Amino acid sequence: MKRINLLLVVFFLVGFVAEVFPQQNFSTSLHSTRQGKIHWYNKVENGGVGGFEVLTNVPITQLGCVECHDAVDANGNQYPANYTPGCVDCHATNSTWAVTQSDCLGCHGRERAIINMQLPDVHRSLGFTCMTCHKEEELHGDDGIAYNSMFEPGAIQADCSNSGCHAGFTHPNPGVDPHGGKLHCTSCHAQTNLACYSCHFESQVQTHLKRTYKQITGFVFLVNRTKDNKVHPATFQAITYEGKAGVAFGPSVAHTIVKTGARTCTDCHQNFGGQIPAITDFNADGVIKFATWNTADSTLSWHQGIVPFPANYQTSLKMDYLTYNGNVSDPVAPSKNWSVVKDVADLFQVLYCTPLTKQQMAKIGMDTTLVSVEPINNNIPSSFALEQNYPNPFNPSTTIRYSIPKSAYVELKVYDGLGNLVQALVNEYLSAGNYETKFNGANLSSGVYYYQINAGEFTATKKLVLMK
């Protein structure tokens, strides 16, 4: 009998150790560090990527959202004022230690909103929960790597092609797959993404209330995800604060997956006979006005369907950024008491993805003559460079060549001798390569001008002479 009891104790200890030991790295997991918001929001000097703190100058520690948590822990107890993330966030430590779907959705509000909207999903209809795809080793940070964001490669291991899911799956007709595996499954199978439109940041700063105009769906931004360089859905978060506007874009999989029928060729390709509002908008004048505030009835309208994230997004992607006109202490509730601040962002963040290239834009029927840059060749340069324009002196036009060794947002501008901006020649995201841009001075007076390039951390200026 003693031997049996001893064996039971041994089995219990072995099981307990096996269960607990992998969690020794929990302190470096994103569920513990909550590093994602810090990385996204903070200035570079404060450990971030130059996020909204650049606009607000309000430290994230004053926002009441660093140690984000649900109203109660998994045991049903309210959180204390001083709180350290731990097991009880997800595990009912006073009973079975089981994790429920509601424990996940208490923090992951975007997914909760999608479910509450009753948007269908093939996985949920089969009884899947968060933990079906997101395994313990991912949630507990078993690899011991302190990720800055869940979008970093390795942070989230769940993917369509994982073993036990759709591993080895190929296009139903691989012999004629026009995309050659360059599209992520969700680009076609996700019905919609979701965004909380235009966060009123004064409410967050002063009263710690999360106030947005409304949650919007029906759209899918398309970007190139840096994790695998595949076309992938993206969403955004926009804010306004004291007359300034900022927006951050990143890859996102809304759990609105359907088996068939989410997206066909004409849902993305205007040149295949499709009628895509965002592409029609762009082809008219080179600008996608994604969302428009209707002053007459205080409502918002926005493009439905796919929205290509264009190469020159800083000048070609606009939306009406809104502010709340009521008191910051007002209860958060649907309201028409909003108005437009501006339609051009003061700050753009594009994280863990890149815009569609000019070539990709052309393939879906976008008028790329509205994008000003032409690549010279397919060679990848080893360093940044800005060449002397030729001819120089010139009349009336000249060519400016430059090289970028890695993808970057590029600005190329011409100034007069007093430093006044004459013309912005380039204002778009470019892949690594060698490029040239034409400058026409037909409407300018003879004289000395300057052209300057800004690409990532690279800046250079050269002189050009217009002689008529």
Tell what function each PLM region has.
Residues 15-16, 206, 405:
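Residues in and immediately flanking transmembrane alpha helices
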Residues 20-88, 100-374, 381:
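C-type cytochrome heme-c attachment and multiheme electron-transfer modules
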Residues 1-4, 468:
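Positively charged n-region of N-terminal signal peptides that target proteins for export
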Residues 8-15:
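Bacterial N-terminal signal peptides
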Residues 375-468:
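C-terminal outer-membrane/trafficking sorting elements
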Residues 97:
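Acidic, His- and aromatic-enriched active-site or binding-groove loops in soluble protein domains
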